[in-house]
Amino acid sequence: MQERKRVLVKFSGEALAGENGFGIENSILKFIASEIKELIKNQIEVGIVIGGGNIIRGVSAAKGGLIKRTSGDHMGMLATVINAIAIQEALESSGLEVRVQSAIQMEAFCETYIMRRAQRHLEKGRVVVFAAGTGNPYFTTDTTAILRAVEIDADMVIKATKVNGVYDKDPKQFDDAVFLNTLSYDEAMQDNIKVMDDTAIALAKDNKLPIVVCNMFEEGNLLKIIQGDTSLCSTVKNN
């Protein structure tokens, strides 16, 4: 009997915008759907967390002082619901069964997040898209990804980004930046690296949850990672 594999994939909201920098690019939705479909074909259970930065960021919205940080974060949570519904549509159009679960109750649009219900959906081969962050301000969608992964007992979190992994410093600014294939949780919290925010990394460390950072636009990358090939990615785990 094949061992159950369950993963949580975190997509940034900005990635959905493509070159436009804002909104949702249909071609990217189609690409994401094709990549997730390959995972389902290979009997991999998939949860997804999506950011909202292509629409609004709570921190940025609050910078001018007119909007409070809590309200800005609430706006950001709603942005993730918009993105989650878009991903749901794309996945369903490719023939997959999908459920969106929101941390904030909004019955007209999606289910309310219930851990055991999410687990049952995954066991039945459905993709579950987790929306509205943790439902609380001051927590990032990266922290949401780790939290949901721990709750659903995922084997790993894959942070699918626009770069191929983690460097010891910004490769856009420094030509001598070194690619890090593996690093510890403590190294991942260093200011010059910042794989995720400290809350997310600390939660992953406490639960020994591996985090793989990869290029989401590399076709077949997600499946390769889950099958054990992380040569083109960065993995955060215990030494």
Swiss-Prot record:
Residues 18-23 are annotated as: Involved in allosteric activation by GTP. UMP binds at G52, D73, T134, G135, N136, P137, Y138, F139, T140, T141. Its EC number is 2.7.4.22. It is an enzyme of class 2 (transferase). InterPro entries: AceGlu_kinase-like_sf, Asp/Glu/Uridylate_kinase, Uridylate_kinase, Uridylate_kinase_bac. The keyword Cytoplasm applies. This is Uridylate kinase. Its main location: cytoplasm. Keywords: Allosteric enzyme, ATP-binding, Cytoplasm, Kinase, Nucleotide-binding, Pyrimidine biosynthesis, Transferase. Allosterically activated by GTP. Inhibited by UTP. Homohexamer. It holds the Pfam family AA_kinase. One of its GO terms (cellular component) is cytosol. One of its GO terms (biological process) is 'de novo' CTP biosynthetic process. It is found in: Cytoplasm. It catalyses: UMP + ATP = UDP + ADP. CDD domains: AAK_UMPK-PyrH-Ec. Catalyzes the reversible phosphorylation of UMP to UDP. One of its GO terms (molecular function) is UMP kinase activity. Signal peptide: none annotated.
